[in-house]
A protein has these predicted regions:
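Conserved beta-strand and immediately adjacent loop positions that scaffold enzyme active sites
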Residues: 5, 44, 96-97
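Core segments of cupin and vicinal oxygen chelate
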Residues: 8-51
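Short hydrophobic/aromatic beta-strand micro-patches
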Residues: 9, 72-74
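Short acidic/glycine-enriched loop/turn segments that link adjacent beta-strands
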Residues: 38-41, 65, 104
Length: 152
């Protein structure tokens, strides 16, 4: 059992969020759903996204997300970055440096693992070039990061 589980208050759209998030991630499933009555709207849902559980609770319009909390997705390939970025961005807002806000207001970072490796390089010139390149991006481009890392 997961010890710490993100609990998201969704503005009256928990069922939509449940279906959306389980369609975005390839390894996703609906674990549990509680409804208000037998055929009523979803009250809460537990979903599993790539092995991590999230609880979604239907809440009124007072609940808002901020960038102070985001979910970091570690991607291995550009295809994975592109796929997750495009799906999560649908109806949302692109932000800088691999961040986006989805249509529910939840903030995500769609980041290739190569970025971390490049930024931890012992050669400060390489890591600074990569940081400079990344700061100009919205969606992260691994080839452009690699180009900056190589100094080409």
């Amino acid at each position: 059992m997961q010890k710490i589980t993100p609990f998201l208050l969704i503005d009256g759209r928990a069922e939509e969020a449940m279906n959306f998030y389980t369609s975005v991630f390839k390894n996703a499933k609906i674990v549990d759903v509680s409804r208000a009555g037998e055929k009523g709207p979803v009250f809460s849902a537990t979903v599993e996204l790539d092995g991590e559980r999230f609880i979604l609770l239907n809440m009124g319009p007072k609940a808002e997300f901020t960038a102070a909390v985001s979910f970091f997705i570690n991607c291995e390939t550009q295809a994975e970055v592109d796929d997750l970025w495009d799906k999560l961005l649908a109806g949302g807002e692109p932000l800088r440096c691999g961040w986006l806000k989805d249509k529910f207001g939840v903030h995500w970072q769609v980041i290739p693992s190569a970025l971390g490796r490049y930024l931890r390089d012992k050669d400060p010139a390489k890591s600074q070039r990569v940081m400079g390149a990344m700061m100009q991006m919205v969606k992260i481009d691994i080839a452009a990061l690699d180009h900056a890392y190589q100094g080409a």
